[in-house]
Amino acid sequence: MALHDRLKEKDAWDIYFTLTNYPGGLDTLVVEIQPHIDHGLVQEGLRKIADKFATVTHVGPKFVADFDDVQEPEERAALMRDAFEKMDYLLRALKIR
């Protein structure tokens, strides 16, 4: 919810870091979240995150690249795509998208 309310680059980066480094990978993270998916705050939080990571060029992926201070266009585009695709995978697996 911090990403939605505060709009800080580090909030998006923290989410990306978790998606990238979660022990066991994204499928394990899905399994960990799944028992809580019907909780209202979980739904609200995931929807707010989904809004920020709606496309490759939305604020979530952009903030990830900004926080890492990636300037080279191809590297920046690749990082933004990776951030979007990981979040998209998680949200689709959780049936948020």
Language model features by range: what are they?
Residues 1-97:
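Compositionally biased terminal segments of proteins
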